[in-house]
Amino acid sequence: MNNIHTTRKANFRWVICAILFFATTVNYLDRQALSLTWKDFIAPEFHWTNTDYGNIAAAFSIMYAIANFFSGRIIDWLGTRRGYLWAIGVWSAGACLHALCGWATEQWVGLDDAAQLVGAAGDVAATVSMVSVWFFLAARVVLAAGESGNFPAAVKVTAEYFPKKDRAFATAIFNAGATIGALVAPLCIPTLARYFK
């Protein structure tokens, strides 16, 4: 009976490792989405400039760096399960906020529909563009805050669920998700963007 329990526990560890791998892969797919859709989809649609891209990317990187100092502490304080859930919740909220940027811009500027937004000219177009950049930047900042919790939580999960002899291998597996996500993103994100355009 004890062998069955030990085998189930060992198998469960590797299921957890696979989930960590998947989460890390999605984490990196998320990060690549902006750069892979900027030139052909985002910039032309919203009339944003390369300066806007630089500001958005810099804000993400700065928030990610700052949030890393706090995410590990938050995960330690909340515990592994709740801490990872917190990180994924914030990260998911940030991802969802991107979808609300157009609506928020319409509400802020007072235009009633997307046709007016796209057809706006002169100073109104500059205002619409500026406001929508700031909403998008805010969504990226929330995304960065949540994504910063992925690695501290994954390392803590590995330390808690795996014996010392398996920790390096388990860490290598979930960490490979970063590279896989970065490699898969150029293959699937532009295709998805074209399909859902």
Question: What are the functions of these language-model segments?
Answer:
Residues 139-177:
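Cytoplasmic helix-loop-helix junction between adjacent transmembrane helices
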Residues 89-129:
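C-terminal ends and interior cores of transmembrane alpha-helices
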Residues 15-50:
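Extracytoplasmic
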Residues 37-65, 112-118, 128-131:
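Extracellular/periplasmic helix-loop-helix junction of adjacent transmembrane segments
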Residues 67-79:
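Helix-to-loop junctions at the C-terminal end of transmembrane segments
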Residues 178-197:
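Helix-loop-helix hairpin linking two adjacent transmembrane segments in secondary transporters
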Residues 32, 61-69, 182-183:
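Residue-level signature of mid-helix packing/kink "hotspots" within the transmembrane helices
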